[in-house]
Amino acid sequence: MASITLTPSEKDIQAFLEHYQTSLAPSKNPYIRYFLKLPQATVSIYTSGKILLQGEGAEKYASFFGYQAVEQTSGQNLPLIGTDEVGNGSYFGGLAVVAAFVTPDQHDFLRKLGVGDSKTLTDQKIRQIAPILKEKIQHQALLLSPSKYNEVIGDRYNAVSVKVALHNQAIYLLLQKGVQPEKIVIDAFTSAKNYDKYLAQEANRFSNPISLEEKAEGKYLAVAVSSVIARDLFLENLENLGRELGYQLPSGAGTASDKVASQILQAYGMQGLSFCAKLHFKNTEKAKKRLER
């Protein structure tokens, strides 16, 4: 999904609104002055003066403000915040979310270091470069432990809304450190509509517009940095949990997880499983059935 952020003059904003006034729609986001639903695009006009255009027709409507596609360089030449999460697809281990602030002058350093999407790097490479990234790059890391995850899922949150809460909090805390991004990109895990819906229940908010983009870790180094740090945090948590229980906990949610889960269930009961795993996964029932054989 195309996403374009602009900061036009107030005169141009008013001209745009007058031209597309029939497309105005309500928005629950308190930082959005005007929201328009247009054919193949949505337009959010923020109180800060920035405009976020999203959808296949984003470039078409952005041209109203003088935007030209050839000028777009995937946002890499901007100081930006990128976020990503790791652990949402793994039965064992917590959920790690990281927001990282990267400026253009850091790009060469990051490329030479071999920064890329954590899914394309070996765990050994991640454990090697993550400490360097943590030291050199301004970031905010959050880890929701399995026990805390199980406590909030089904009560206040579901598997999607809990990620919205963590991404929002990571960005909020990073902004509190004084960074000034010209763009904020989230590696999309849900639609913009769903994100805004769940965001409404969060107390900590900020006025900066955000962009949810699929496969953002391959487009933005800031997202790639977050992906690496989050993967490192997840792996460290997985090791620590396994060490406390005396088991090597596998990543993912396959049959290996079912087998280890049944062993932990037999040794420690549901309390032990709740300590190290996300109980709403189907692996929990599969582990129980293994013990019944």
Curated annotation (Swiss-Prot):
Q: What is its EC number?
A: 3.1.26.4
Any one Gene Ontology BP term: mismatch repair
What keywords are annotated for this sequence in UniProt?
A: Cytoplasm, Endonuclease, Hydrolase, Magnesium, Metal-binding, Nuclease
Catalysed transformations (reactions): Endonucleolytic cleavage to 5'-phosphomonoester
Q: Which organism is it from?
A: Streptococcus pneumoniae (strain JJA)
Mostly located where?
A: cytoplasm
- Quote the record's cofactor note: Manganese or magnesium. Binds 1 divalent metal ion per monomer in the absence of substrate. May bind a second metal ion after substrate binding.
Give the gene that encodes this protein: rnhC
**Can you name a GO cellular component term?**
cytoplasm
Q: What is this protein called?
A: Ribonuclease HIII
Family classification: Belongs to the RNase HII family. RnhC subfamily.
**What biological function has been recorded for the protein in this entry?**
Endonuclease that specifically degrades the RNA of RNA-DNA hybrids.
- Give the required cofactors: Mn(2+); Mg(2+)
Q: Does the keyword Hydrolase apply?
A: yes
Q: HAMAP family under this entry? A: RNase_HIII
Return the InterPro entries for the record: RNase_HII/HIII, RNase_HII/HIII_dom, RNase_HIII, RNase_HIII_N, RNaseH-like_sf, RNaseH_sf, TBP_dom_sf
